[in-house]
C-alpha cells in the first residue's frame, strides 16, 4: 500500500466513542516497550504519528488513525507493565475485551513481540484471546537488528514453541533497517481485501483470561 496521508481521528474507551463509518480496522497490540510505536511510524512513513511515552504504561486509550481513505489503524494500549496501578488495569480489560470481541470493523490485529524476549503469559493470553474471538493475528517480531542470525533462529524457535506458531506466521521487522516493512504491509493488505472481509467474523465466545493492559 502506498501511504499518502495518515491522520489522527480520535481516542476512545468505549463503543459510543468509536469512529462512525464502515472503514475496516487493523489494530496493533503488544507489551509496553515492544517497539509498537516505531513499527507504526515506519509503516506509515511518519516520525512521530504514534509517540513513545517516556513512562511505559501511560497509554490508556484506544487511538484511531485514518490511513488514506482505505482503513483505520488502531493503536491499542500496551500491556504487561508492572507499575501500573491495579485499579487502572481493571478498567482496561473490559475496554479491550469489548473492542476485540464486538467491533465489526476489525479485520485483524498485529501482535508485536520483541525478538530478545521470551513471550510472556500476557502475550500467550492475547493470542488466545484473538483466536477465541476469530480475529486474525499478524505476528511481528521487532528489534531484529539487535541480535545475530544465530540468536534470531534460537529465539524464533522459542517463540514458535511457546505460542504454537508456524515459521511462516512470523514476520521479522527492524525499525532501523526497515527490514520486513513490505512483508507486514502485504499481510495487512491481505486482511483488507474484500475476500478477507467475507470470512472475518467476530465471535461471541466467552473470552479466555485476558492480559492486563498498560
UniProtKB/Swiss-Prot annotation:
Its cofactor is Mg(2+). The keyword RNA-binding does not apply. The keyword Magnesium applies. GO terms for molecular function: GTP binding; metal ion binding. Mg(2+) binds at residues 37, 59. Signal peptide: none annotated. GO terms for cellular component: cytosol. Pfam families: MMR_HSR1. Gene3D superfamilies: P-loop containing nucleotide triphosphate hydrolases (3.40.50.300). Transmembrane segments: none annotated. GTP binds at residues 30-37, 57-61, 75-78, 142-145, 173-175. Keywords: Cell cycle, Cell division, GTP-binding, Magnesium, Metal-binding, Nucleotide-binding, Septation. HAMAP family: GTPase_EngB (MF_00321). PANTHER family: ENGB-TYPE G DOMAIN-CONTAINING PROTEIN, MSS1/TRME-RELATED GTP-BINDING PROTEIN. Necessary for normal cell division and for the maintenance of normal septation. Belongs to the TRAFAC class TrmE-Era-EngA-EngB-Septin-like GTPase superfamily. EngB GTPase family. This is Probable GTP-binding protein EngB.
